[in-house]
Swiss-Prot record:
Note: Bacitracin is thought to be involved in the inhibition of peptidoglycan synthesis by sequestering undecaprenyl diphosphate, thereby reducing the pool of lipid carrier available.
Gene this chain is encoded by: uppP4
Annotated transmembrane regions: 1-21, 39-59, 71-91, 99-119, 133-153, 173-193, 208-228, 239-259
Reactions the enzyme catalyzes: di-trans,octa-cis-undecaprenyl diphosphate + H2O = di-trans,octa-cis-undecaprenyl phosphate + phosphate + H(+)
Keywords: Antibiotic resistance, Cell membrane, Cell shape, Cell wall biogenesis/degradation, Hydrolase, Membrane, Peptidoglycan synthesis, Transmembrane, Transmembrane helix
InterPro entries linked: UppP
EC number of the protein: 3.6.1.27
Species annotation: Bacillus thuringiensis subsp. konkukian (strain 97-27)
Entry's Gene Ontology BP terms: cell wall organization; peptidoglycan biosynthetic process; regulation of cell shape; response to antibiotic
Keyword hit for rRNA processing: no
Record family assignment: Belongs to the UppP family.
Gene Ontology CC terms, in alphabetical order: plasma membrane
Name used for this protein in its record: Undecaprenyl-diphosphatase 4
């Protein structure tokens, strides 16, 4: 893989990690486009580190607060919200890894993501702010996050959807969703590093790794800040239409043996 391909994959990871359209699904498509095999595993890990950097930079005040107040309500909300994904991930890791490798269900998963985005957008706007979020809210939102273990089910999409259903206001829904992404991204990095150390990753140039990581961080930061502002006044339907169109295209290509 050359540095330009890594740069493009970094853009894909950075934008789609925080837009509700599935980063894993788009990375799968990107690897298919560039004819990369499972190999890009180490690059995937570095791309996740890039988006993690984006979250850390955007939420630097919150993370400083969490470090100083490790038993705060916010920390407990993040822990409670992360439990479902941890349980599902540990129990079914191998099963979902096999699904991710084949990509056979990816078209259907994009359609499912679109359905949830479309339906959630019809909900009346809630009024809950960060201080109003309950542990029950966090657990339910985290349970929706666990569904994103399917490669083309959007993590940010599902958590924003759940947050809107739990009557968080639109800005807070996106804000909490991205904050909750931190433990999930860290978990993904740990699991990927475990595979890397077991020799499942290809050799890739340091230049490509650095370019991909910085690209993911830069575009991830843009996506976080833009999405929070966008959701204040705009609909999720445009994202639903996009993933529906993408899902239909993929299913058509699979049906005709083109993909």
């Amino acid at each position: 893989m050359n540095w330009l391909e890594a740069f493009i994959l970094g853009i894909i990871q950075g934008l789609t990690e925080f837009l509700p359209i599935s980063s894993t699904g788009h990375l799968y498509l990107g690897r298919h486009l560039f004819q990369l095999d499972e190999a890009g595993l180490f690059l995937d890990t570095m791309l996740h580190i890039g988006t993690l950097l984006a979250v850390f930079i955007y939420y630097k005040k919150e993370f400083i607060y969490l470090i100083k107040n490790p038993f705060s309500k916010l920390m407990l909300l993040l822990i409670v919200g992360t439990i479902p994904a941890v349980v599902i991930g540990l129990l079914f890791k191998d099963f979902f890894e096999d699904i991710s490798k084949t990509g056979i269900t990816i078209g259907w998963e994009f359609l499912v993501t679109g359905f949830f985005l479309y339906v959630a957008d019809k909900q009346k706007n809630g009024r809950k702010k960060m201080g109003d979020i309950t542990y029950k809210d966090a657990f339910i939102i985290g349970s929706f996050q666990a569904a994103a273990i399917f490669p083309a089910i959007s993590r940010s999409g599902m958590t924003i959807v759940a947050a809107l259903w739990r009557k968080l206001d639109r800005e807070t829904a996106a804000y909490f969703s991205f904050l909750l992404s931190t433990p999930a991204i860290v978990g993904a990095i740990i699991l990927q590093f475990a595979d890397v150390f077991q020799g499942k990753a290809e050799s890739i140039s340091s230049t490509s790794l650095i370019v991909g990581t910085l690209s993911a961080a830069f575009f991830g930061y843009i996506a976080v800040s833009w999405m929070i502002q966008y959701l204040k006044r705009h609909s999720l339907k445009v994202f639903a239409y996009y993933v529906w169109g993408l899902g239909i295209l993929i299913l058509t290509l699979q049906f005709t043996d083109v993909f």
